[in-house]
């Protein structure tokens, strides 16, 4: 479990137009379990949230107010990671989920796992692999380096198709983010974390800490922040 004293700050880009917007956002987020402080910045179009609530719950709470949100950074510098989980087999949506990791204390990291588009309803099991080599998909990621014993329950119907499910989970592990970077992250139906049961796989990469990412236009594509968000949503990256 995470102690309230092990809170972290995360920043989110959120469209806001006036003081009424900031008030509604603050009220919605303060109702989320684990949220301790909410600080909207109308001029910068950013909302800072401190607490122990997973980023996915913040994004969901903002969506309930009719607003989109983009996680811009979380935790201290060099204390966050992300993995896009792609299908480990042919067929179905190519992207099956997202993992956000935030270190909240020395050798203690929160894993916010969101799955969407996997066969189900079903129970799925997550593990961090020894290797980040995905040249042969899950088969080349090597043995399990760390396993999460509890299942990710995918019990909601996915909007991506019939007989597909969605679900999320919040896990805590005695790990430092520095040790995670470049490792594979696998989700599968096998409780023993065997490669044969792999459903989705990705590679953990470093992500920005709070206030480290103020980009509004992509230097590569020229797309704005919200154009990139639209492309990500189309690809099932929530």
Swiss-Prot record:
GO terms for cellular component: cytoplasm; cytosol; mitochondrial inner membrane; nucleus; protein folding chaperone complex; superoxide dismutase complex. Keywords: Chaperone, Copper, Cytoplasm, Disulfide bond, Metal-binding. GO terms for biological process: copper ion transport; removal of superoxide radicals. Cu cation 2 binds at residues 218, 220. PROSITE patterns: HMA_2. It is found in: Cytoplasm. Belongs to the CCS1 family. Copper chaperone for superoxide dismutase 1 (SOD1). Binds copper ions and delivers them specifically to SOD1. This is Superoxide dismutase 1 copper chaperone. The lineage of its organism: Eukaryota, Fungi, Dikarya, Ascomycota, Saccharomycotina. The gene is CCS1.
């Amino acid at each position: 479990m995470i102690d309230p004293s092990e809170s972290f700050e995360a920043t989110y880009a959120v469209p806001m137009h006036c003081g009424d917007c900031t008030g509604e956002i603050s009220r919605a987020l303060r109702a989320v379990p684990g949220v301790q402080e909410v600080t909207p910045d109308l001029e910068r179009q950013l909302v800072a949230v401190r607490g122990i609530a997973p980023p996915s719950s913040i994004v969901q709470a903002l969506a309930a107010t009719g607003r989109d949100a983009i996680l811009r950074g979380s935790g201290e510098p060099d204390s966050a990671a992300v993995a896009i989980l792609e299908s480990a087999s042919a067929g179905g949506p190519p992207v099956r989920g997202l993992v956000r990791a935030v270190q909240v204390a020395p050798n203690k990291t929160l894993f916010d796992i969101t799955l969407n588009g996997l066969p189900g309803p079903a129970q799925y099991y997550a593990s961090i692999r020894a290797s980040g080599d995905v040249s042969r998909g899950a088969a080349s990621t090597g043995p399990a380096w760390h396993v999460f014993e509890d299942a990710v329950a995918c019990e909601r119907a996915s909007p991506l198709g019939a007989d597909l499910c969605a679900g999320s989970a919040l896990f805590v592990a005695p790990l430092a983010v520095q040790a995670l970077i470049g490792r594979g992250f696998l989700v599968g139906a096998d409780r023993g974390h065997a490669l044969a049961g792999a459903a989705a796989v990705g590679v953990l990469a470093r992500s920005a800490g709070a206030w480290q990412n103020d980009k509004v236009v992509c230097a590569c594509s020229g797309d704005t922040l919200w154009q990139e968000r639209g492309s990500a949503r189309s690809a099932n990256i929530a």
